[in-house]
Amino acid sequence: MTNGSTEDNSYRYTPGLAAKIEAKWQKHWADKGTFNAPNPTGDLAEPGAELPEDRKFIQDMFPYPSGVGLHVGHPLGYIGTDVFARFHRMKGANVLHTLGYDAFGLPAEQYAVQTGTHPRTTTMANIANMERQLGRLGLGHDKRRSFATTDTDYYRWTQWIFLQIYNSWFDPEAKNANGTLGKARPIKELEEKLAAERADWADLSAAEKQEILDSYRLVYRSNSTVNWCPGLGTVLANEEVTAEGRSERGNFPVFRKNLQQWMMRITAYSDRLIDDLEYLDWPEKVKSMQRNWIGRSRGAEVTFDCLGNDIDVFTTRPDTLFGATYMVLAPEHELVDTLVAQSGNSSSGSDAYTDVDPRWTYGQANPAAAVEAYRAAIAAKSDLERQENKEKTGVFLGVYATNPVNGAQVPVFIADYVLTGYGTGAIMAVPAHDSRDFEFATEFGLPIVPVLAPEGAEAGAGEQGGAELTEAFTEDGPHINSNNSDGLELNGLGKAEAIDKAIEWLESKGVGSGKIQYKLRDWLFARQRYWGEPFPIVYDEDGTAHGLPEDMLPVELPEVEDYKPVSFDPDDKDSAPQPPLAKAKDWVEVTLDLGDGEKTYYRDTNVMPQWAGSSWYQLRYIDPNNDNALVDIENERYWVGPREGRPSGGVDLYVGGVEHAVLHLLYARFWHKVLFDLGVVSSFEPYYRLYNQGYIQAYAYTDSRGVYVPAEEVTERDGKFFWVRKADDAEGVTKEEEVFQEYGKMGKSLKNAVSPDEICDDYGADTLRVYEMAMGPLDTSRPWATKDVVGAQRFLQRAWRLAVDENTGKGSVSDDALTDEDLKALHRTIAGVHENYAELRDNTAVAKLIEYVNYLTKTYSAGQAPRAAVEPLVQMLSPVAPHIAEEMWEILGHSEGITYESFPEWDEKWLVDDTIELPVQVMGKLRGRINVAADASREDIEAAALEEPNVASHIEGKTVAKIIVVPGKMVNIVAK
C-alpha cells in the first residue's frame, strides 16, 4: 500500500520522492565518507588535522546476523543512537559510531544446519542482507570500522586476548593502576617469584612446575559440573538453559555432568567488578542485577566434624549456629561418596538404613542406593530449577556431623537446592529462621530450634523443638537459646554484635573464621561446536597444554565438510561430547617448534563461547586495521581513556537490551580489567554510560488450536477478531475464522513481524525513523501500529512545504523578519529540542518539532514562512530525519551538507513569558484566574486578584484579613 496523494504535484513529498531523496543522500554520504571519524594516529588519522577535544564514542550492542532479517523492532536502538550521534556532530564533537556483527555461535550454526549450507556462507549472506536493510535507514556509521567476529583478522586478536589472560595470574596483594589491591600479572613474574621464595623450586621437574603455574592461571582446565545437552551435542552455559532444564535453542533436555573444561577465573575480580560499578553511569536496575549476580556477602566459614571429615560451610549468620539442626550437601559434593562409605559397617554404604525415618530414605534400602537414585532423578534439572526447589526432596547419608557450638549431632542430607558452585557446596540448616530450611525440616520431620525472638517477646519463648512455630521467623530480633559453657554467650544481643562475637569464638576455637563469599562462579569457556573461535592451545603427547606464541596466530577455523555437531539421543545423559573439530584430523595433529625442537602436538578441538567476540569489540572499533596491536593506546586513550570526572574511562554511550545486563557486560568488564592490569588499555571500564532501550511490541493472533495466523489477514469486528483468507478449495471464495488476540513480542514465528523494507517502500525511511522515535520514550516498550505511521509522514510533508514549492521543487521562503511570537516559538523549540536530544528523549523532541511546524503552518501561507524560522527547523530536524533535512538544506541554497552544520542556539530572553496566569483562591478554594505581567509587583498582583469578578463576588461584604501571594504560583485571599 502506498500512502501518496493523487495530486499532480511533481515535488510533493511522497514515498516515491522520499525514495529518490534517500538514495541520493545515502550515496553522497558514502562517497564523501561523511561519517568517518579520524583517529589521533594510525591509518584512520587525518595528517595535519587538529582533533576536537569533544569526542563521543557511541556504540550499539552487537547484532546477530539472523537469517530471517530484521523486523521494525530491531532498528529502534540503532535509530536512537544515530539521532544522538548526529546531534553531537552538530555540536562540534568528533563522533565514532559504527556497527559490526556478532556472527559466531550456536544460532548461526544451527541455522546453517537447518538450511544445509556452511555457516560461513549463511552468515555472510545474512550480514549482507542486514547491511542492506540497515543501510536504507540512513544510519550514520563509519563503515571503515565495521567487522564481523568471524573475520580472521578479528578473531586473531580474540585469540591473542585469550593468551594474555591464560599467561596471567591474579596477585591479590599487588596494587593496580586504579590504586586498589589485586591485579593480573604475567605468569612469568609468578615463576620468578616462586623461584625466589621456594627452596625446592629448582628440584621440581618441568611437569611439576607447569602444574603449579597452571593452578594460578586466570584460564585453567577444571573437572567441573556442566550443562550437557546430548540433543545439541554441546555443553551449554547456565544462561543457555531454561528454568525447565531444557536448552533455550531447540528445547532439548539438559543434564548435569562432570567434564574437564576451560574456565576463566572471573571470580578473582569479584570485588573490583562490584566496587567499580560506582564509577559508571548505568541504570541502577542493571547495577543491582550485577551486584546480585556476583553476590558478595560477609559471614563466616564454619567447620563441622563428621567421622573425621571436615565439612566446611559458609554462612552469613554464624550467630544462628545454635539453631542449626541438620546439614545439607550438594549431591555432587566431593565428600558425599566418602561419607556414604562410612555410614553403617560396610565400606560401600550398602548397609540398610536402621531406625531411620522413611521420609529420609528416598524409598531405598540403604544410603548408597538412595544417593544413586537421587542423583539420577535430578540429573536433568537446571541450577535455576534446583534452586526454586518447589518440591522438597533429599536423602539422608546415614551419618551425623557435630555442631561446633553445642556438640549436637545433626543429620547430614543431600538435596538438589544446594549447588556445588555456590559457597562450599554445603549448608548448615537453621529451619526456625530460613523459609526454605523450614519447609525442608517440616517435610522431613527435623527439629526446629528458634534462636531469634521478635522484639518484646519473652526470653524463653519458643523452647527447643519449636512446636509453636508455624513458619520461619526471618526478621531480626534479640538472640535466645544461644549460649554454651565454653564462653559463647549471645542471648539478648542484636544481629551485628552477635555475628562479631560468634566469629571471634569460632576463630579462638579453630573451627571457623570470618570470610567474604561470592555467588559468582568461574566462567565456563568452552563449547563443543564448530562455529566459533578455535583455542590457541595445543597439547603434547602427555596431555600438557601449551599456549601458542603470538607469531602463530591466528589459529584459523578449518574449512570442513562435516561441521555438524555430533548429537545424541536427547535423553542419553551418559553420552559424552565429541566436538566437530575432532573430525578434522589433519588440522588437529600438527608438527610445531615451540622452543625445544619440532614435536607433534594436538590442537584443542573445543571452540570459544559466543561471548568471546563481544567481550572486547569496542576496542577494535577504535583501531580496526591495526596489524601490530589490539589497539594503539594513543587511540584508545583519545576515545575511551580517563577524563575529568570520569576516572574509569569507557565508551560514552552503550545502547542495548536489558537482557544483556549481567553476562555480556560482566564478561566484557572482566576482560577489560585484565587488559588494563596488563597495560594494554588506559581505561579500567569498557562502558561508561549504559542505556537500555525498550522494545517494539505487536499484537499476535492464534486460532482455536493455538497456532499463530498472519496478523495482516486479521480484521476486527464488534470487539472480536477474525482471520479472513481465501479458502483452499474455491478460488475467490473467502473463509473466515474467529481468532484470539495476544500482545507481546514481534517475530516471524508469531506471524506478526513487519519488515522495515515494507515501511521504507510505503512511506520512506525518514518517516519510519520519525515514527519510531515519536512512539514513546526510548527506554520503554511500545506497541507497533502500521496505521499510525502516516502521521509521521504527514508531519514531514508539512515541514517540506514550509521550505519547498511542490510545483517547482525550488526553495519557497521569505526574507521577512521574525515577529516576537515567531521568536518565542523558535527559541523555545530550539531549547527544548536541544535538551531532549541530549537526554535521549527523542519522542518529546519530535513532539516539539511537530508543534513548531504546526505553528508556522498556521501562521504563514505557502512560501511565506521566513527563512530565519525555517532554516533552524531544518537543522533541528536533521538528526531524526536526515535525508529530507539534507534535501531541504540544499534546496534552500546551501552548498555544504547539514551533517556538520552547527545546531541552532537559543536566546534566554525569549524563554521568559511576558505575562503569567495565576490561580486565585478565597479561603483555600479556587475562585478565579488572573493574567499579570511576569514582573508585576506584589501590589499589582493583589489589586488584580481583588478585581477579578468572581473573586470579588465571593469577598463582597467580608473583610479581607490577609492576601498571600506565592510568586509565580498562586494567590490566596483570607476574608472574614
Swiss-Prot record:
Keyword tags: Aminoacyl-tRNA synthetase, ATP-binding, Cytoplasm, Ligase, Nucleotide-binding, Protein biosynthesis
One Pfam family in the UniProt entry: tRNA-synt_1_2
Catalytic reaction(s) noted: tRNA(Leu) + L-leucine + ATP = L-leucyl-tRNA(Leu) + AMP + diphosphate
Molecular function as annotated in GO: aminoacyl-tRNA deacylase activity; ATP binding; leucine-tRNA ligase activity
GO biological process: leucyl-tRNA aminoacylation
Motif extent ('HIGH' region): 63-74
Record-stated family: Belongs to the class-I aminoacyl-tRNA synthetase family.
GO cellular component, one term: cytosol
Coiled coil: none
Enzyme class: ligase
Binding site for ATP: 748
Predominant location: cytoplasm
Locus of motif 'KMSKS' region: 745-749
Subcellular location field: Cytoplasm
EC number(s) stated in the UniProt entry for this protein: 6.1.1.4
Organism: Corynebacterium jeikeium (strain K411)
SUPFAM superfamilies: Anticodon-binding domain of a subclass of class I aminoacyl-tRNA synthetases (SSF47323), Nucleotidylyl transferase (SSF52374), ValRS/IleRS/LeuRS editing domain (SSF50677)
Top-rank lineage group of the source organism: Bacteria
Protein name: Leucine--tRNA ligase
Keyword Mitochondrion among UniProt keywords: no
